[in-house]
């Protein structure tokens, strides 16, 4: 695939050509800017410039205005009278590249500290509490060049939130006690990443360049860099924070995006009032004209040992900063070709040789002044033995591009694809939208900020050739990641401990690559037949319903249909679940269902890639009930792709070589689960404990040896022999077309796979374990990789119903912010602290998830202590405060989906849970508004208090790798620490030694009854 900006270097942490833009409409008809109100800068000396003509999509109904304040802050205002949430973001064009050399992570630490009190609002959780009480949320991130802060809040409370937010940049406190505690949060955040291959590889890339270049810095920071070493060197970190903020948090390096229901004039006045006082220190914009990879860092090979059993090849070329060429984007053009996955592509040839599975290519951001061009592949076992040959093929393909020269029709196709994507772009959630815009305001003229990353305007063959000229063997760096290098390395990266070996690439290998000749198997892509040409929005049918309606109900299928009446874009979502009793009957069958679909997707890749480029994607995966298929995007060519997928499903022939490769990759992925985070392990074990049937990773690994090619070939017709299909077709589609699509799916399966219907008795869902009253169970396991503990504590409450859902959700709303403030900010238990509802198979409860260096039984005691404090907090809560929480939860629940796929996902969730409560939000919010404080206190005392008669609790304790054992319960007196509330004395829990025996001894809940009476709903 073409490398996209969101994709990191490493996997985490995808001519006579007809125009599709309405016969090349003039710009005034394709795109439009607003100038509905004439707001003159003469009205206010705080405004230096106003940009009225923000170019936007014709489909975008929001109003925009750009501002440059007198102090240099760039602003984009977005007036959206329909938004449920308002949002704002501020991006400071400073990041970890500007950290002082002796305090690594200071910019990141500064980001953390700004949340913890300001002169105007000194209470350290004032900002988060205000947002929580008004259905809001916030976050921030620090990168090499940016520190980005953002929030959302109910639309009525934008001004209050923005006022608190603005103080971050005017007068933060950097309180000493907060500083001492928050350094632990940064350290915990780093500790979470230490055994993560994505973070390790990123830091190693930085560490193997010029050590004097800012790119080489350790950006996250940890306790050593932010406390221990500064103390040793006599550095006052609080003073350094104040100095960093006063130096770099300058208005001329800031950009703001604000989105609200208010008019543009009101938004203008609000921003001017709150941000015009931010001081302009005229800080020069940091630029890095020298590339971190100089001649001595090129023609180098790095052999790297990963934590997980992965095999990757990273080929990197230093290139100049191409940012200023955004209107022609030569990196995009080359990434499109080198990263192509169709017939004749580089990936196609490498896969045919059995050397790689995936490929990503394209430009990668560095910082102002430098970039990289990357070609990354996932290696097979055979591919690891042919790295030189793989890179030779890369240079053969690059040579093909040189020989062909820049092709204007390819550029035109990219231009048209991007223009369609921009014109029919889905509406984003406000928080993500403002954060992104604030970040890119630094790079583009105000008028072009919405279009710059989409619209291509100038075909510049000279720039394409300039970048192509950088993709040469003498300009290359190569990194190979494989467990096979264990014990063969001689270097260790400082911050993450990554083991690696550095070697110069031999001259004869460089010469071999330089002499790469043309490979006749490489071809430029064919013209993309999936680019949509019909963008007609269909008229709403007379019988259109506000929610999905059942338009077909037979022994073979249930078809739900909903014509889009909200978004009016030429898109649709087609969701199918194929129920089969053979898909999950045992670990062997689960493995075979997985491999069948992985091989199927692998064989479809060349065909479906063109559709993906044209905005039409599909997802296919095995589930515990069978198979799930979704096809999303422009509806014009959607049936063509769907038909191809179903035909392939029904007639699939397995390629033996790909079978062995994908089976081996699957085994590695099962083994790699051991290296997931402790909190993820805790969630995994809890699911195994609570679900009636769930196969473990170990059971799947053991059964995988029994999956042979003949056995898998025999399994596929068995899987397809009897099915029940439940589908939701939703979007720019008619009822008749939906029925036709469903008939095509059924006919194809019947014709090629001789599929017959399932019996109704075979459509029963799995159920959830029912915990006994006053029961407390503990399950303990150890994580072999990470040096942190993880815990999930689950208080099972009851079956889902309108009343039970609202009791639980309102309680979660009330405790959410205090939980974070108490357990993370004040007690510093760890970076990951979460509370909220857990729902599975119609059963629900309250859960806490924590990852920490502290032992699980201590975390358990702190959660219990916190719950006791919340009982008093709720009892003492004023009616006004209680009603704020009800209103906040109501706003969250009634927050409208921003795009078709999000609305479809809500409806699909109702269908696959077999609850079918499509109007759930309105029904439950109406009930929510009747609740009283006494209802919640009663819910707590009955279900959650230590002595509650209907308390049902299970805890999963995941021990750190260096812990051999740990008590499941303990007492931790807090008299010596006045900041800690006293934990209750806990009874001795029942320790689960065997999952099967645990489940065998307990009853199961019944399934939740559907909201719809299907006998009445039948046509």
UniProtKB/Swiss-Prot annotation:
Substrate binds at residues 359-363. Homodimer. Can also form homotetramers. It is found in: Cytoplasm, Cytosol; Cell membrane; Secreted. The SlyX motif may be involved in the non-conventional secretion of the protein. A motif (SlyX motif) lies at residues 853-858. The active site is at residue 111. Its EC number is 3.4.24.56. ATP-binding induces a conformation change. Keywords: Allosteric enzyme, ATP-binding, Cell membrane, Cytoplasm, Hydrolase, Membrane, Metal-binding, Metalloprotease, Nucleotide-binding, Protease, Secreted, Zinc. The modification N6-succinyllysine is found at residues 192, 697. This is Insulin-degrading enzyme. Its cofactor is Zn(2+). It comes from the Eukaryota. Zn(2+) binds at residues 108, 112, 189. Coiled coil: none annotated.
